[in-house]
Amino acid sequence: MFYKILFQKNSAYDIIVSENFLEVLIMSGEKVIFCGNNPDFLDKKLTTLSDASNGGNAFRIPSLIRSGNALIAAIDRQSCGADWGYIELAIRRSEDGGETWSDIQIIAIPPARKTMLSDECYGSAFYIDPCMAIAPNGDVLILVDFYPECKGLHKGSILDKKKAPYALYNKEMRPTLYDRDGKFYVIDKSGHVLNHRYTDTGMTVDYESGELYSGEAYLGNIHLNGKSPSNINEAGAKTTFGAPLKAPKRSYLYLLRSSDNGKTWSKPKDITGQVLIKQDGTFLGVAPGVGLTTHKGRVIMPLYVDRKQTVSIYSIDDGEKWHRMAGHPYAENVDEWQMVQAPSGAIIGLGRAKRYGKTPMSISYDDGKTWINAGKTDLYAPKCQKSVISIGDYVFCSHPNDKTRSNGVITVGKTWINAGKTDLYAPKCQ
């Protein structure tokens, strides 16, 4: 049966678990890794836990993983408490099992016209929803959503539903840009911008950062709205302005990598074109938390689309190239999800129900290539992302224990084999 461990009662804290879950339970009871200091976005009593080492205006959506001798915690560092606005990607590290932590390190900074501390301000691109995994070679991978300036899914009417974000050029899917007349441009491997006839325009762009140039002249950022103001900002400044060519407004999948247990990080790299299909629409997003490195060395990351269907992508070369699951374009699950691997090799996916109730479950028997619907497990939770890990044939899942996002608990279940198939033994929590 499931056993329930109280984690954080009557709070709206995000809940995170690592493979050293008992260590993290103790640590989390004594230390707060990230804590907002703005009472507009967090209960004033909780902001008193914020200090110079862990504080910021607002934090949401954490991910925690062990890499070598280090614990790495990643999170959205926000200008407000919304799913949009100026959102950086931040981490902290611990090399003593969570007793002490490094200062906050910003590893991805979005371009912005404005960085106001208000949920009414969305004059910025943003990162959101990190998901970490450890590649077989030891590299730490973070997959995260990136949006050009907009409100993401919360204002779908301004997303570019009719603009293709990638075009086939030299046998490879390359990013596109559009001018105000709707003409498209393609960015080649070297960053040169080609027009719709694939002729070099003389413009170059660092696609992930978005900085566009004509020769040495700075033209603005392809991920921002607007055009050059009278008081021109310098390239690389905290705020800048929109370029005359713009990337389509939609979600993108950016990958960051660390080869030294989280001390230093690569620049974000767009991998969306490797796994996107037309049916996904304007949103193919990361299911935040942690990915899975299977017994066979395959790295799997959980995604989902706006219709709340799930997708898994995988890499067999330490995260260099990514592939979409085979067969049906969507996995048999719902919304944001997480996965664990049983000793039998089966992979169990736990989804996010549309309302309070049993947790939808899917299972893969071929290392994440295909998935089958496994019904619902008797793990009751509201509409909220879970965190789930496995140790042997035991499964530990953190989730709210209420019809709202409160009363966080960790429930413990067990995988078992029935008629040659793996299942999760999950009767109603006691």
Question: Which positions does each model-derived feature cover?
Answer:
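Asp-box/BNR beta-propeller blade signature and adjacent active/binding-site loops
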Residues: 3-10, 21-430
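Polybasic, low-complexity RNA-engagement segments
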Residues: 17
